[in-house]
């Protein structure tokens, strides 16, 4: 489980601490 920011797979944590989809 090496997710950036600990978000759901396919999502990335933004600067404001939210998880947004990368697709």
UniProtKB/Swiss-Prot annotation:
Keywords: Cytokine, Disulfide bond. GO terms for cellular component: extracellular space. One of its GO terms (molecular function) is cytokine activity. This is Paralytic peptide 3. Coiled coil: none annotated. Hemolymph. The keyword Disulfide bond applies. Causes rapid, rigid paralysis when injected into Lepidopteran larvae. The physiological role may be to reduce hemolymph loss following injury and promote wound healing. Belongs to the GBP/PSP1/paralytic peptide family. Disulfide bonds join 7-19.
């Amino acid at each position: 489980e090496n997710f950036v920011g600990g978000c759901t797979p396919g999502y990335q944590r933004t600067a404001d601490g939210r998880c947004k989809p990368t697709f």
